[in-house]
């Protein structure tokens, strides 16, 4: 669980997302409140429920990116889902309970990785011993018992030192590794997901404990054996309980495109399913118990963050009960030409840095002038105004158009320096930006 302060969280998000200060603050406070709640004593801790968030803003302004970056910062079970993928009970499609099942699976991976890291030192020693046994099979007496001598120990220590220094990395050895579990995909009708999970677990258990001899380089064998040995040191039941606790206390669910399941007054028929999805979401958001293959999971303290463009529907089109369970509303503003300019240069791994690095692999040095950045930003902004406003995603289209000629010829331009200035941008984009018909089809 992250112990970062709200200011630190916002500062970290600022490195990747331009603007949208209100949304960053709301998310940062919500994440910090998870930590604050865990510091409380039990009777009060149970009463403090998370304040769920509804992010409202046009497409391409950073809603989903905030969720992606939050997942990395949270160090907690996190899942992002599309509201449109779900249907109400009785319709063909995924049920909303699968959100919690997927979140629990995510928590299992997170907790397993944490436990493996805790046991890594012991696992490394055991893995080294197995590799040394393969390199130097221990001598046995006439009764088949392993004999240890000073010379054997000395040789073993010499090889252990070489192994740790990487001198044996490219040598190949035969080792016994755990056989991969049987991957059985079972299609099930709605409402039968739990039964299919149990069947899949049964098939996986059939192959568990089996080993397979493989020929591998020592470098790769060491990684495989460390994971294998670490898995032996982990108690599966403890792992399940820790994963369930992590989901119940620190889990975060990000529901994107929630505006697409709003009921619109002028439609009927299929919209019944849309409202049904909202009603199915209610128990999850309010607090219920969901059965998963790892155990029963309570959703009372899971944080839900919903987002939507709400260009056709409005937040008030959500059913009142769901509106009441998303008390914090945050509006994200549309991006300006100045924002586009900052997006091109300020974030870590900005678009311009990405293209420079890609072309550098071919030995081509790309230079962007300040004026060219400004013109690219203006071009993207103008196309958004003339056609559909898709926010910062327009920059990807514009940059691909701008870099098209260089990307195609880069392999023949090794050692050259290409300076992208205002004239270059106008030459590449000018006609397309000015002609609205071309903009619609090309940009």
From Swiss-Prot:
Domain of life of the native organism: Bacteria
Gene Ontology biological process terms, A to Z: protein unfolding; proteolysis involved in protein catabolic process
GO molecular function: ATP binding; ATP hydrolysis activity; peptidase activity; proteasome-activating activity
Gene3D superfamilies linked: 1.10.8.60, DNA helicase RuvA subunit, C-terminal domain, P-loop containing nucleotide triphosphate hydrolases
UniProt KW keywords: ATP-binding, Chaperone, Cytoplasm, Nucleotide-binding
Gene Ontology CC: one annotated term: HslUV protease complex
Localisation: Cytoplasm
Main location: cytoplasm
CDD domains, per the entry: RecA-like_HslU (cd19498)
Record: residues binding ATP: 18, 60-65, 256, 321, 393
HAMAP family assigned: HslU
Function according to Swiss-Prot or TrEMBL: ATPase subunit of a proteasome-like degradation complex; this subunit has chaperone activity. The binding of ATP and its subsequent hydrolysis by HslU are essential for unfolding of protein substrates subsequently hydrolyzed by HslV. HslU recognizes the N-terminal part of its protein substrates and unfolds these before they are guided to HslV for hydrolysis.
Family: Belongs to the ClpX chaperone family. HslU subfamily.
Subunit structure: A double ring-shaped homohexamer of HslV is capped on each side by a ring-shaped HslU homohexamer. The assembly of the HslU/HslV complex is dependent on binding of ATP.
Name used for this protein in its record: ATP-dependent protease ATPase subunit HslU
Organism per entry: Pasteurella multocida (strain Pm70)
